[in-house]
A protein has these predicted regions:
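Bacterial Sec signal peptide processing site at the extreme N-terminus
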Residues: 15-43
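Extracytoplasmic beta-rich repeat domains
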Residues: 20-28, 48-81, 105-121, 144-161, ...
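Structural signature of WD-repeat beta-propellers
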Residues: 90-92, 129-130, 169-170, 214-215, ...
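Short loop/turn segments that connect beta-strands within beta-propeller blades
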Residues: 98-102, 138-142, 178-182, 223-227, ...
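Blade-level signature of beta-propeller repeat domains, shared across WD40, Kelch, NHL, RCC1
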Residues: 365-395
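Loop/turn-rich, solvent-exposed surfaces of beta-rich toroidal or solenoidal domains
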Residues: 302-309, 317-351
Length: 395
């Protein structure tokens, strides 16, 4: 009897082990078939030629605080500006920097966080504090020329012209100020969207008309002198039924050429309008919150999946699409010497052929995730998500 029980126990243990082994194999098989994250950043090849040389770098030591979990909070300011050989950016204070050497030429004390970044031109630099007050300072002396309370946040840089300063608030109010004395020339309030979770665009001036895109997904054309509205049109139509699908924020500044103006929005379209009456000439699918670029008779944009697309500016047809950088959180696009340049979340800077989208070069910067880039002559200025700046020579 005892031997029989031992036999039963041995059979049970063997069977149990086999069952556990099968379960393990099944789990392993299941794990083997788990799909990769479809939104994981695309891996890139780094064996292309280098085309940049670092000139100088300035770290933003006041760009973050430590949260309770010990994580870095990104800098609020992600916009710098340039005027001549000077660079304007916000670190502990607003600094005026020599682009060639990186030397700080002047500091302007700032007592509050700046959400709008800084804009510069026509002898002044402009920024808006987090409490909604706009400051206009003299470029040479740094002294304040005038200020005005907007009572609302501004998330995008101001537009400076020879006579006016234009700012758009987060609640879709466009203000036009007199450059010299700060007098309000006119203002326009758009019908706000029921749902808006993104930023705001900057207004654009072309042939005496101010083109402004709003969170409700509409583009308006107003006369700069008196604010009279010539037309207002939707950039795209609502395609879904959920609130998120109805989100149509337009954070991209409009762009104009000859008798046409182009605008794009999130979850929407790239649309070409007639400047004079707002008639829609074409509309093609595009979801973006990044600036549009025009090159010859084409338009360039990156969509929300970080694909780079070139469109025919006449009929909207797609000329080429590069999907090699999907989900790499690429920066705005800039053009230099017939090539397209942009940065990504790992601090890489990429160069594409504008004719066909072919990858031509790659360079590694000393910064973190690159959010903003600009070209001045043969220099590339880049800024990362912590507000640090690096200037590189293009060769």
């Amino acid at each position: 009897m005892t031997n029989f029980l031992k036999y039963i126990l041995i059979v049970f243990l063997i069977t149990g082990c086999q069952s556990l082994n099968n379960i393990g194999n099944n789990i392993g098989s299941t794990i083997g078939f788990i799909e990769e994250d479809p939104f994981a950043p695309t891996k890139i090849q780094t064996d292309y030629e280098n085309f940049l040389k670092s000139n100088w770098i300035k770290r933003n030591t006041n760009s973050f605080k430590f949260s309770e979990l010990g994580k870095k909070r990104p800098a609020k300011n992600l916009f710098f500006a340039s005027s001549g050989d000077r660079l304007f950016s916000i670190f502990d204070n607003l600094e005026v920097i020599d682009i060639t050497t990186g030397e700080t030429l002047k500091e302007v004390s700032i007592n509050e966080s700046v959400m709008s970044g800084v804009a510069a031109g026509y002898g002044v630099f402009v920024y808006v504090g987090e409490n909604g007050e706009i400051f206009v300072n003299n470029i040479e002396s740094g002294e304040n020329r005038w200020s005005a309370k907007l009572n609302d946040q501004v998330l995008s840089p101001a537009l400076i012209t020879s006579r006016y300063i234009l700012v758009q608030t987060s609640s879709d109010v466009l203000y036009v100020f007199n450059l010299s004395d700060g007098e309000t020339v006119w203002s326009k309030k758009a019908q706000p969207s029921l749902l808006s979770i993104r930023g705001t665009s900057s207004p654009m001036l072309y042939e005496g008309l101010v083109f402004t895109s709003f969170s409700n997904g509409r583009l308006s054309a107003n006369r700069i002198t008196d604010g009279i509205q010539l037309w207002e049109r939707p950039i795209s139509v609502i395609k879904g039924s959920t609130e998120l699908e109805k989100l149509k924020d337009s954070d991209s500044q409009a762009i104009a050429f000859e008798e046409s103006v182009y605008a794009a929005n999130f979850n929407g379209s790239l649309t070409r309008f007639n400047i004079r009456d707002g008639e829609k000439i074409f509309s093609v699918d595009l979801s973006t919150s990044k600036p549009l670029l025009m090159w010859r008779d084409t338009l360039l944009s990156s969509n929300t999946d970080d694909e780079i697309i070139q469109f025919d500016a006449i009929n909207g047809n797609e000329k080429w699409r590069n999907s090699s950088f999907k989900y790499r959180k690429i920066s705005n696009l800039v053009i230099h010497d017939g090539n397209l340049l942009f940065g990504d979340y790992e601090g890489y800077i990429h160069k594409l052929n504008l004719q066909n989208g072919e990858i031509l070069g790659i360079s590694k910067s000393k910064l973190n995730s690159i959010k903003n880039i600009a070209v001045i002559s043969n220099d590339l200025i880049i800024q990362d998500d912590l507000g640090s700046i690096e200037v590189l020579s293009i060769f």
